A protein has these predicted regions:
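Nuclease catalytic cores that cleave nucleic-acid phosphodiester bonds
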Residues: 107-243
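Domain-level signal for Mg2+-assisted phosphodiester chemistry and nucleotide/NA-binding surfaces
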Residues: 2-135
Length: 244
C-alpha cells in the first residue's frame, strides 16, 4: 500500500507557500503548566494512515503526482471555513491544521521531506514511532480533540478520516453540544458519516485544487458499458490473524 509520503504534491515545486497563515500549536502546548491564552479555534485532524489506505484503494496502487492531495489547497479551504465560522459566531476563529502519522523504524529520512513540506505550509505534525502493528495514532488524535475541548477553545472540528470506529461517537457527542462537526474523506469509505444526521461530510474531491485530475473512482452507480473492476478496500492478507 502506498505511503502518505507519496500522497503529497511535490514539495520542491513551490506548491507550498511559506506565507499561508494557518495556526500552528504553540511549542508550549506540550507544557502542562503553560498559561498562554489560546485562540478560539477550528481544528483539523488529518488521519494520515487511514486516508493513505483509502486513496490507495481507490487508485489500486501508488498515486502519481496528479493524484496526490495538495495540502496548500487544503490549507486554503480550512482558512475559508474558519472565516465562515468567524462570521457565524461573530468572533475571531483561528484554524489549527494538524496531521497525525506513524514513522516506521529506519524510515525517518524517507518521511522527513514530507513532514517538512507540511510544516512549511502551516500544518503541525504529530509523528509517532511504528513499533508494532498495535502502535497507531488513534488515541493521540482523540486526546488532542479532547484537550482542545477541555480548554474551551474548540469552536469547530474537522476530522479527515474514514475511521468511524475511532471517531464516530466522539464527533457525534461534540455535535450534540452545538460544535460544528465535519468529516473529510472519500464517500466510498465513510458511509457512517455520509448517512449521519448530525455530522457534515465533505468529499476530498469537492475541495478546489486538491487533486490535479479527477480520481478514477468507479462505483455500482456509474459503471462504464464495458464493466469495471471494483478494487478491494483492504488486502486479502488482512484476514490473517495479526494482520491490519
Amino acid at each position: 500500500m502506498t505511503s502518505m509520503i507519496d500522497t503529497i504534491h511535490e514539495h520542491s515545486s513551490g506548491s507550498f507557500p511559506c506565507s499561508t497563515p494557518v495556526f500552528v500549536p504553540h511549542p508550549t502546548d506540550n507544557d502542562a503548566t503553560s498559561h498562554h491564552a489560546k485562540p478560539q479555534g477550528l481544528l483539523l485532524i488529518w488521519d494520515a494512515p487511514n486516508l493513505d489506505m483509502g486513496l490507495g484503494a481507490i487508485l489500486g496502487g501508488r498515486p502519481t503526482a496528479a493524484y496526490r492531495p495538495r495540502f496548500d489547497a487544503i490549507g486554503r479551504w480550512l482558512l475559508d471555513r474558519s472565516q465562515q465560522l468567524s462570521e457565524q459566531l461573530e468572533t475571531r476563529i483561528e484554524p489549527e491544521a494538524t496531521v497525525f502519522t506513524n514513522v516506521a523504524p529506519g524510515g525517518a529520512d524517507v518521511v522527513r521531506p514530507w513532514v517538512e513540506a507540511l510544516r512549511n505550509v502551516g500544518f503541525a505534525v504529530f509523528a509517532k514511532p511504528k513499533l508494532d502493528d498495535d502502535t497507531d495514532v488513534d488515541p493521540d488524535m482523540l486526546a488532542h480533540i479532547r484537550r482542545r475541548h477541555s480548554e474551551g477553545v474548540l469552536k469547530g472540528i474537522i476530522v479527515a478520516s474514514a475511521d468511524g470506529q475511532n471517531f464516530r461517537d466522539e464527533l457525534e457527542q461534540l455535535a450534540t453540544t452545538g460544535i460544528p462537526t465535519t468529516v473529510l474523506g472519500f464517500h466510498e469509505h465513510a458511509s457512517w458519516a455520509v448517512a449521519s444526521e448530525t455530522l457534515e461530510f465533505v468529499d476530498l474531491e469537492e475541495i478546489p485544487g486538491v487533486f490535479r485530475e479527477p480520481l478514477p473512482r468507479i462505483s455500482l452507480d456509474n459503471l462504464p458499458e464495458e464493466g469495471a473492476w471494483l478494487q478491494p478496500f483492504r488486502p486479502l492478507s488482512s484476514l490473517l490473524p495479526g494482520r491490519p
